[in-house]
């Protein structure tokens, strides 16, 4: 009887599984290629989501066998994942209007903004997080927090756990950097950290939100943290109204929320009070968990790779000696000179990306990607971790090698930086009259070749008329000389800019063949270009107008530039920055997060060494395949201001004052 029951149970499970396979096949039928057929997909049991199977049962789909595009499941919804770099650029390109952000698990204010609102938010928050002025202002705050940690009782006890002590240290540091030094700031930040560090119990309550109405321990804790997260509204309001000092005695502490408020105040449009109270742009998963993950993984790898630790110490020592600095006096410019440390962080992000997938996009209309039909409403994602560990992209991808990242130290792989919000506003405030003088000649460029003769006659007549107006134009140019110079750097009218770029790009394509990503590159239009058509001599004047777009920090992607890169170079750069996202929606806090981690590493590793601290039950935690849940011992023999060249520690002389 017992065996019969087991047999019936097995039969029922098999029938259910086969029925599930049939339903999945029917659900994924539209994802079809005209030759290859239906798209590859993960196994049916992943219809319940990857979370329980990967974490609880340690089961993972064999993604390498699925190709460059495949579908996997989040409950009943198929999510198409793409690993081809060109397809990723196509979907996640900021100019793509068919693929909008979609994330139903997070009803964030980020996703209800559209059009010019997104550009305005992006401009202000980008400047606050990435301007050199902002980073220089916030760096002393980071240094003071690290020194406080070194002098604390926890640090002096020598043995620290990354799960407890290092995490608490990072919470205090990040709350001070982002929100300020008040207790409200710390409690608000910690509550947001818990929001993005959810457990299975949180996930279960997300699936069944009515459970929160039951007076349980979890629901009470949830409501308490929710109220603490609401403190952000108060902190943002204080920052918003505190930009203008009421008296000379007022002191505004350096924090990112105050810098954002100041940047908004100095911006040409700025943010309203309700907009600056939106927490999603400042307190999100990447800004909160990103630096923590980077620090823990880097400390773990440096313990495992003593030769890399020695190279970092050597670079710190060389930069300090070169610039006459020490651990107390180094500044932002000194850190920017540490290229090997930069490469080490990039390699950490490649091997252990803070987030394994990019934020999904949703198709507004049906499309084809890599030949497969993608129906309207399909969610598309990018498996970052799988791409960054793909042998076709990196040789020996599972090995930690910072040297492989040094190729990206070439300036062409780096986005040009901006100094302050005034630079963007200044470049966009040029004279509209001076731009119009350049733009009036554009219609003659955009005419078809069949009408060139008629246009030449018309242009001659126009030139005669223009000669009569030369004196007026010269007077305008003379009076607005400085404005015209600014005009060569920025378009004032975005509508005219778009119409010119769209029209002129097609003309340039017809004349000059190129495999460059940016069709408007200057080297194809200079005097050495082989343009033999006499009717197109006016194109030699175009570079001055194109220079407007090239030097504009917004239109020329001071945020996200692929200008003058080949397709291969562009793909290399996409892979390099993939841990932080791609396109206009990539993580804005990348440079700030890296500055925080660099400062921590420079201060700690210029004075201390790290060793494993193993208990009898801790050996399995030191497996390099696991997350760095290890304990770290700060060597008590090292005293500041020593600089460690290798594990054989010795003192070095202080820099001369």
From Swiss-Prot:
Q: How does it sit in the membrane?
A: Single-pass membrane protein
The residues that hold heme are 587
Segments for region (Disordered): 440-486
GO MF annotation terms = heme binding; iron ion binding; monooxygenase activity; oxidoreductase activity, acting on paired donors, with incorporation or reduction of molecular oxygen
| UniProt keyword terms in alphabetical order | Heme, Iron, Membrane, Metal-binding, Monooxygenase, Oxidoreductase, Transmembrane, Transmembrane helix
User: Transmembrane residues, as ranges?
Assistant: 2-24
One GO CC annotation, please?
membrane
Residue ranges, compositional bias (Low complexity): 446-486
> Which EC number applies?
1.14.-.-
Q: InterPro entries this protein is in?
A: Cyt_P450, Cyt_P450_CS, Cyt_P450_E_grp-I, Cyt_P450_sf, Insect_CytP450_Detox
Taxonomy, superkingdom = Eukaryota
Indicate where this protein resides in the cell: Membrane
What are the names of the required cofactors?
Answer: heme
The record's annotation in Gene3D superfamilies points to: Cytochrome P450 (1.10.630.10)
Specify the enzyme's EC class, one word.
oxidoreductase
What protein family does this chain belong to?
Answer: Belongs to the cytochrome P450 family.
What is the official name of this protein in its record? Probable cytochrome P450 556A1
Q: From which organism does this entry originate?
A: Dictyostelium discoideum
Task: Name the lineage.
Answer: Eukaryota, Amoebozoa, Evosea, Eumycetozoa, Dictyostelia
- This chain is encoded by the gene named cyp556A1
């Amino acid at each position: 009887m017992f065996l019969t029951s087991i047999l019936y149970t097995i039969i029922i499970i098999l029938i259910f599984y086969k029925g599930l396979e049939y339903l999945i096949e029917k659900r994924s039928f539209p994802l079809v290629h005209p030759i290859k057929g239906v798209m590859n997909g993960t196994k049916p049991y992943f219809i319940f989501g990857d979370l329980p199977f990967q974490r609880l049962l340690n089961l993972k789909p064999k993604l390498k066998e699925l190709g460059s595009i495949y579908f996997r499941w989040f409950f009943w919804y198929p999510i198409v994942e793409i690993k081809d770099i060109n397809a990723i650029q196509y979907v996640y390109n900021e100019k793509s209007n068919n693929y909008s952000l979609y994330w139903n698990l997070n009803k964030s204010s980020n996703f209800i903004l559209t059009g010019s609102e997104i550009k305005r938010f992006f401009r202000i928050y980008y400047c606050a997080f990435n301007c050199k002025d902002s980073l220089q202002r916030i760096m002393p705050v980071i240094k003071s927090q690290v020194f406080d940690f070194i002098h604390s009782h926890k640090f002096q006890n020598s043995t620290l756990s990354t799960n407890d002590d290092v995490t608490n240290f990072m919470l205090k540091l990040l709350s001070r950097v982002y929100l300020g030094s008040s207790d409200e700031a710390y409690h608000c930040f910690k509550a947001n950290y818990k929001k993005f560090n959810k457990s299975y119990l949180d996930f279960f309550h997300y699936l069944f939100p009515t459970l929160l109405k039951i007076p349980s321990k979890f629901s009470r804790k949830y409501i308490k943290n929710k109220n603490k997260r609401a403190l952000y509204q108060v902190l943002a309001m204080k920052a918003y109204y505190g930009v203008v000092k009421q008296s000379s005695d007022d002191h505004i502490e350096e924090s990112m929320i105050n810098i954002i408020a100041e940047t908004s105040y100095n911006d040409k449009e700025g943010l309203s009070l309700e907009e600056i109270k939106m927490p999603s742009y400042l307190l999100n998963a990447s800004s909160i968990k990103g630096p923590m993950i980077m620090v823990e993984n880097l400390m773990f790898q440096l313990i495992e790779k003593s030769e890399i630790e020695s190279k970092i110490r050597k670079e710190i020592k060389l930069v300090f000696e070169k610039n006459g600095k020490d651990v107390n006096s180094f500044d932002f410019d000194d850190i920017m000179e540490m290229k090997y440390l930069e490469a080490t962080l990039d390699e950490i992000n490649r091997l252990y990306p803070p987030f394994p997938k990019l934020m999904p996009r949703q198709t507004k209309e049906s499309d084809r990607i890599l030949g497969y039909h993608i129906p309207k409403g399909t969610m598309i994602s990018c498996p970052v971790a799988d791409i960054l560990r793909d042998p076709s992209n990196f040789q020996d991808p599972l090995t930690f090698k910072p040297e492989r990242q040094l190729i990206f130290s070439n300036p062409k792989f780096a986005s040009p930086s901006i100094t302050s919000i005034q630079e963007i506003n200044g470049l966009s405030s040029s004279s509209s009259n001076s731009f119009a003088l350049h733009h009036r000649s554009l219609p003659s460029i955009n005419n078809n070749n069949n009408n060139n003769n008629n246009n030449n006659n018309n242009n001659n007549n126009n030139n005669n008329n223009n000669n009569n107006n030369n004196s007026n134009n010269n007077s305008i140019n003379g009076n607005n000389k400085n404005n015209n110079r600014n005009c060569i750097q920025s378009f004032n009218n975005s509508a005219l800019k778009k119409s010119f770029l769209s029209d002129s790009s097609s003309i340039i394509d017809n004349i000059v063949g190129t495999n460059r990503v940016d069709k408007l590159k200057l080297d194809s239009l200079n005097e050495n270009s082989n343009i033999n058509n006499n009717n197109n001599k006016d194109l030699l004047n175009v570079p001055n107008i194109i220079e407007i777009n090239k030097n504009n920090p917004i239109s020329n992607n001071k945020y996200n530039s692929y200008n003058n890169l080949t397709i291969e170079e562009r793909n290399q750069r996409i892979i390099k920055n993939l841990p932080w996202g791609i396109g206009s929606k990539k993580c804005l806090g990348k440079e700030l997060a890296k500055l925080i981690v660099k400062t921590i590493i420079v201060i700690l590793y210029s004075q201390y060494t790290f060793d494993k601290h193993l208990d009898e039950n801790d050996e399995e935690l030191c497996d390099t395949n696991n997350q760095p849940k290890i304990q770290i011992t700060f060597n008590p023999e090292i005293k500041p201001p020593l600089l460690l060249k290798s594990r054989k520690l010795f003192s070095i002389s202080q820099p001369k004052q």
